Amino acid sequence: MKIGVVLVLLTVFVVVMSSTSVSAQSDEDECLKETGQMQLNCFPYLTDNRIHTPSFACCSEVYTVGKTYVDCFCQFINNGGPSFGIVVSQKLLDLPELCGVYGACGNGKNFKNTSL
């Protein structure tokens, strides 16, 4: 039940973030929207110690954000998602590799191909 409430709040946050329409910040807004969706899809894996493998939906978002919004992706992987209650953990740091997205955030940001 508690996770249901959190997911509803996360959904509301993503909707609010995606409805922002300031043209000067469109890239930043899109990045926040994409990161929010990634956090939403990866939330169960990142917060439940009984889940040992991220879902396809989670990995799909990790791939998309990792390829399209590299700076934002690296910031999330290195700093967590405090607005979603996601803290830096080994699961978060392992997420790109588990989803087949390889690269060095902050060190060339060169992601290799994946097989999603």
Swiss-Prot record:
Residues annotated as glycosylated: 113
A GO CC annotation given for this chain: plasma membrane
Disulphides: 31-74, 42-58, 59-99
InterPro entries: Bifun_inhib/LTP/seed_sf, Bifunc_inhib/LTP/seed_store, LTSS
Stored Pfam families: LTP_2
The entry's keywords: Cell membrane, Disulfide bond, Glycoprotein, GPI-anchor, Lipoprotein, Membrane, Signal
Gene3D superfamilies on file: Plant lipid-transfer and hydrophobic proteins
Subcellular localization, as worded in the UniProt entry: Cell membrane
Signal sequence region: 1-24
Primary location class: membrane
Membrane topology field: Lipid-anchor; GPI-anchor
Domain of life from the UniProt record: Eukaryota
Lipidated sites in chain (GPI-anchor amidated asparagine): 107
Residues of the propeptide: 108-116
Tissue and organ expression note: Expressed in seedlings, preferentially in roots.
Family listed: Belongs to the plant LTP family.
Function in brief: Probable lipid transfer protein.
Protein name: Non-specific lipid transfer protein GPI-anchored 17
Organism annotation: Arabidopsis thaliana
